[in-house]
Amino acid sequence: IAAMGGEAVANGDDVSDWEGAQAMVNQAIETFGDLTGIVSNAGILRDRMLVNMTEAEWDAVIQVHLKGTFAPARWAAAYWRDKAKAGEEVNASIVNTTSVSGIYGNPGQTNYGAAKMGIAAFTIIAAREMQRYGVRVNAVAPGALTRMTEDLGMGQASEEDKALMHPRYIAPIVTWLQSAESSDVTGRV
């Protein structure tokens, strides 16, 4: 990021940890003087058919995906609400990552699909709640080929299809949703 002229700060907190999420948001505000957006993109897989899934596998996926979306958003939302109530202009954005698996389902992913569908609902409701404070909330549902999805059979796709699933096609959408150009877009999945 710095090599490309940007600024960045590392943070090793767990997005699903309440205090860690608060520390993450506070670190961004203290480092950069403000917070204008967050992107929730943490994820894990613990795939198993429903009859074989353990409680720990269910809980781990729900914790990272759903609580890991909620906790940072909650602390950022409180910051933006306080700014708006103080009369300051807020033009902020939350972009969450859901999945086509959460929308259409995928065998062996009841935990993952439930978490991702939960993120979709969270996005729509949070958008309605936060719009009055100048905050947009949207989600992307990529079908990208990553290290995490290679083992799901996506790695078996043709080279042409693999090229189309490259994550580089998702970043411009997320960047646009974080920009002022998308100021009239909220509550979209």
Model-flagged regions — what are they?
Residues 12-23, 55:
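The beta1-alpha1 cofactor-binding region of Rossmann-like NAD(H)/NADP(H)-dependent oxidoreductases
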Residues 4, 104, 120, 125-135, ...:
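Active-site-adjacent segment of SDR/Rossmann-fold oxidoreductases
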Residues 139, 159-189:
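C-terminal helical subdomain
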